[in-house]
Amino acid sequence: MNHKKFFQNAVLLTATGLILRAAGLLLRVLIANVLGEEGMGLYSLTFTVYNLFVTLAQSGIAVAVTRLVAKHLALKQPAEVKGALRACLLWAAVLGGGACLLLFAGSGFLAGRWIGTPDCTLALKTLAFSLPFMTVSGCLSGYFVGRREVKPGCISQLLEQAVRIALVALAVFTVRDGGFAVMLAAIVAANTVSEGVSCLYLAIYCRLRPMGRGAVSPPRGSIRRIALPVAASRYLSTALHTTENMLIPLAIARYSGSYSLGLAQFGALKGMAIPLLFFPASFLNALSSLLVPEVTDTSARADWKATRSIVERALTVTVTLSVMIGGVFLIYGRLLGAVFFQSETVGMMLTVLAPITPFMYMDTIADGLLKGLDRQAKTLRNNTIDSTLRIILIAVTVPFFGIKGFLGVMVFSNVLVASQIGRAHV
């Protein structure tokens, strides 16, 4: 493990992550001020449906290219590196295009039957066109991560966020009087255009970069062997999360008698409180992505002592940092909710969820470690248990206790997942 390069990459990714999260938080504040809490609920549900197709489009290809590139570089096989990238790009283009067609064709049904209003149809159609760009750029980013080159990915993300913010601001000031459906479509159009810009940048950068002559295609089934467990985990996890997100406003409505209130409280939680809670986690997200090639490298060389050392240090850093962050939210949660969103509800949610911040952050790191160790099946098991239990508890408790019942469900499920991670042995 090259400690200097790993540290440099971690610093670069962390700085990029902080900028992106700060910009993203600013963007959410802007959108929340325009759409309101109920509108944020519909905005969150729109992206819940969209994320289902994002998962279908990505299908673990980015993880596959990262692991294959890291493995072949460790074994000094440059032709195999180029072949792995080509094969994964082909898969990414096919999957992204297929997911785009499915979402575009089914947007009317999904908006009316799943979200509950046809006002979201145009937004879903607009988001569909971002899927091919997203899958290809994700594959290219995974390639560079496998090479321990994080700079291209960082630049593309900064460029993407800058374009997104500029276009959302333009939409807010130009189509504010066009009605909710038009406003929502204009806001998500920024997402589609920014994904296209990011993909174009990465494609040009990769094209201009010398890669040598010759390419050896990866062994038959090698991409599927890595991607399918990751994809299966994400398919199931996303399907369960989609069910959970659709169920929450309905369950709150049964408690309060108002679906509008259910949407408003759901929007406050998923669209405001949770993004703010994960704002400081930029370093951990950077660490998680960098751990995949590092752990893949050491395990490919059967250097289990180095692997265990990486895992132990990653977990120690995660626990230390997350406990401090949780303390800040516990003390200043209500103030932060008032400052950013002028909402007492958001402040209450931050305060309640602050003690489980270490458990939520730990899940991020564990995911990267397990992918690097080729133990995606464990991630699938943990996610399945967690999401299934949450859905059952939501159906049982939220109709009787409202949003406070769901916050209790979140606390319980995160503690359960953390206990499963704690019992895992590398």
Regions found by a protein language model. Give the residues of each.
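Short runs within selected transmembrane alpha-helices of multi-pass transporters and secretion channels
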Residues: 20, 62-63, 126-145, 153-161, ...
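Short membrane-interface helical motifs at transmembrane helix boundaries
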Residues: 98-116, 324-342
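Residue-level signature of transmembrane alpha-helical cores of multipass secondary-active transporters
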Residues: 13-17, 51, 92, 126-127, ...
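Helix-loop interface residues and adjacent transmembrane-helix termini in multi-pass membrane transporters
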Residues: 34-37, 117, 146-147, 177, ...
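Helix-loop junctions and terminal segments of transmembrane helices
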Residues: 59-74, 274-301
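N-terminal membrane topogenesis motif
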Residues: 1-23, 79, 83, 217-238, ...
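Membrane-water interface segments that mark the loop-to-transmembrane alpha-helix transition
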Residues: 63-108, 122, 305-325
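Interfacial/gating helices of multi-pass transporter permease domains
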Residues: 31-52, 180-188, 221-226, 230, ...
